[in-house]
Amino acid sequence: MSEGMRFLLDCHVASKEGKCSVKVADVKDFWNGQKEIRILDPNITACREKRDLMKQYRETGALLDFTQGLDIRCLNDEDIEDINHMRLRALHFAWDNPQDDLEGKFRRFAERFRRKSNIGMVYCLTNFNSTMKQNLYRINTLRSLGYDPYVMIYNKPSAPQEVIDLQRWCNNKIIFKKCPNFADYVPTRKQK
């Protein structure tokens, strides 16, 4: 679970499920040879038994979808090696808190991951304890490393127009590729 979501959901999820994932079953307990497995665990990377689970998922040979994403802060070299031997749908990560210096962790994953472009989508929470400078730093850093940043706006109705423009610029991949610098982006407004 991402830091921003952890903050927002702590009072609900953590009280029910705890802050760490716990292995409750082996893969063979639910997998009957299906070609695809959707893993709904909110943070498999925070599970003490992750090594065993990663091995089991890898050995199925099935197409894996970590629907809740992976926590870049918890991934180590062994995890990346396991991931490199899995058949995967798109990977998802989050960099919600700009105070977390995650550039090194994203760089390490990018260097060790088998794909060298389109590594995965990274959700970036904005309008929640972040400045535009911090937002742009995260977006530009992720793009330079081969990730696909995706802007999420906390409390969008009260967000400044600049943050809304940032979301449109970043999340519209045609615009994002044609206009690589947000300072050069000229948003169009609907006329009333």
Kindly give the residue locations of the regions a language model identified.
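Core AdoMet radical
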Residues: 2-7, 12-109, 119-128, 148-152
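Anion (oxyanion) recognition and catalysis
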Residues: 58, 114, 140-143
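Short, intrinsically disordered, low-complexity segments enriched in Ser/Thr and Pro
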Residues: 112-120, 181, 188-190
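Auxiliary Fe-S-binding modules of radical SAM enzymes
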Residues: 127-192
